[in-house]
């Protein structure tokens, strides 16, 4: 690949670093709409979410700690935060997630099947439950169960029908993309699990809740409200935008666009040239070492 292709091009030093979003001065309140069908009800169809940015992609221990918190607070049997929200009927279902596949991971709590007028109570219950946990301590057995659950999954490395090597490479890519920390930390997690087991009795998880879920200005409370006819409205706006763009083009520009489209379709439908395929180097059995690398 290098000898026959890459070596014929000049190296470019491209600034591909993804910049971090600056923290908000205060938690934001956002209301958005999403489309529903005409025969679908709008009542009990709102989504409420409590979202906080937590750390960065390089901190593998914090990432695993928030996975454990998601389990202990919202997924485990009798999870306190989920149960409290269900008790006040904040929504028909409550769940959470932690996403560390981006530069600045976030933790979210979601109430599905709710209404806009439940937002204040939704937020109040979350803060009350989390505040009590910080003050009185988290359920250590639930946290330990979460750590054991994720450690077992890590040791088993059962990715179902997906190749293990592919899944490991995707884990590594999560850190590698952002040029932070050690990319291999994602596949060297045993030390992380040992540290978390010790941290259970050191107030570590309570401090994460206080710092990132209660006193963190970098977050938002989102209300996602259903609206009938929104899909048709957006489609009409897009058609008008495209028609305005089309009207701005000359006949020559339109003809050139048509020709480019035809050329693209012809390229996509054409089969591979056998001679081109023969140029691809094939791995020979003699290229493979008998001994595994140590």
Give the positions of each predicted feature:
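Conserved catalytic-core segments centered on acid/base and nucleophilic motifs
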Residues: 1, 109-111, 130-134
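Short aromatic/hydrophobic-glycine micro-motifs
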Residues: 89-91, 175, 182
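Ordered core of a single globular domain
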Residues: 119-143, 180-265
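Non-catalytic beta-strand/loop surface segments
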Residues: 3-60, 71-124, 139-167, 171, ...
